[in-house]
């Protein structure tokens, strides 16, 4: 079962060059979430 999931988790050969970018993509929404707090701190949590 784990090998089946691992097979689906691997990028196709044509996209192997983008693997580092794909690893970072899930973190982008977290940066926006943190940006909200920084922005609100800058304007005083109004």
From Swiss-Prot:
GO BP term, example: photosynthesis
Keyword Transmembrane: yes
Pfam families reported for this sequence: PsbK
InterPro entries: PSII_PsbK, PSII_PsbK_sf
Transmembrane segments: 25-45
Pro-peptide region(s): 1-9
Membrane topology per record: Single-pass membrane protein
Gene Ontology CC: one annotated term: plasma membrane-derived thylakoid membrane
Keywords associated with the record: Membrane, Photosynthesis, Photosystem II, Reaction center, Thylakoid, Transmembrane, Transmembrane helix
Protein location: Cellular thylakoid membrane
Keyword Endoplasmic reticulum carried by entry: no
Family indicated by similarity: Belongs to the PsbK family.
Function: One of the components of the core complex of photosystem II (PSII). PSII is a light-driven water:plastoquinone oxidoreductase that uses light energy to abstract electrons from H(2)O, generating O(2) and a proton gradient subsequently used for ATP formation. It consists of a core antenna complex that captures photons, and an electron transfer chain that converts photonic excitation into a charge separation.
Quaternary data: PSII is composed of 1 copy each of membrane proteins PsbA, PsbB, PsbC, PsbD, PsbE, PsbF, PsbH, PsbI, PsbJ, PsbK, PsbL, PsbM, PsbT, PsbX, PsbY, Psb30/Ycf12, peripheral proteins PsbO, CyanoQ (PsbQ), PsbU, PsbV and a large number of cofactors. It forms dimeric complexes.
UniProt protein name: Photosystem II reaction center protein K
Native organism: Prochlorococcus marinus (strain MIT 9515)
Name of the gene this protein is made from: psbK
């Amino acid at each position: 079962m784990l090998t089946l999931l691992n097979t689906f988790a691997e990028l196709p050969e044509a996209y192997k060059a983008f693997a580092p970018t794909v690893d970072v993509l899930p973190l982008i929404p977290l940066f926006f979430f943190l940006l909200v707090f920084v922005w609100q701190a800058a304007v005083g949590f109004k």
